[in-house]
Amino acid sequence: MSDPFMPLFSVRSGAGFKAADGVYGLTVQIANVYFIENPSAPREIILVDAGMPQSSEMITNEMKRRFKEGYELKAVILTHGHFDHVGAIEVLLELWNVPVYIHEKELPYVTGKADYPPARPDAKKGLVAKLSPLFPRHTIRIPSVQALPSDGTVPFLEEWKWVHTPGHTPGHISLFRDKDRVLLAGDAVITVEQESLADVVIQKQELHGPPAYFTADTQTAAASVQKLAELEPEALLTGHGIPMTGKNYREDLLTLAEKLHSVL
């Protein structure tokens, strides 16, 4: 059974946006999902993450609005299995019988075998952090889920590769397209201080590490930020917050990684 609706909002909730060439985003309350067109078959759409609980209608309506008639959802790629990234997956799979891909180390959390660790409300100040023990962390069961290919390729998306970015969760991944240096980071890095309710509501744009209250291994998370810096991304499309584009973010990410190593 799906989790109940959670009354968490931002001013951008329901807003769709073009994030990069062939990549479109949708803010679902406080989290982003992304639609990627298959360059070899432009009517084929890959969904990255599945939003908040009870958000399936918002996601399907955006697909209809954005892609009009004739599109086909081919697969769902999950950056990880937290509730705000898998919230609509159950209903979406009732509408589309498609494969779901996730890192092999994340499989226990989406196959009924393991719950995520308890939230850490005191990891960082902020009202969202204080509320985090109320957020769902229980395992779910996705019948069609399977591990991503071990060679880093992304099904249906030959221009993209997946990068293991653990720390926030053991099997967290990010996606990278080398030709234009687009990084779809998931929660490995985000562009809003997710612990702060005020910043979440207004979507104050600022580079941050993953939400501290749900980050299991903080030092590994910092190392993952450093790994992403070495990709020299020029567009940061994140699981929370407004995308950042227009420059090489290597130095910004290295600075963030150093900060995280020192304070987490």
Residue ranges of each PLM-predicted region?
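Residue-level marker for buried hydrophobic side chains located in beta-strands
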Residues: 46-48, 77, 100, 182-184, ...
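Short, structured coil segments at secondary-structure junctions
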Residues: 19, 95-96, 232
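Active-site HxH/HxHxD metal-binding segment of metal-dependent hydrolases
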Residues: 54-56, 64-146, 259
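C-terminal/domain-terminus segments
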Residues: 114, 119-132, 234-264
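Metallo-beta-lactamase
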Residues: 3-6, 12, 52-54, 106-166, 170-248, 260, ...
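Conserved beta-strand hairpin/beta-sheet module of binuclear metal-dependent hydrolase folds
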Residues: 12-66, 174-186, 190-191
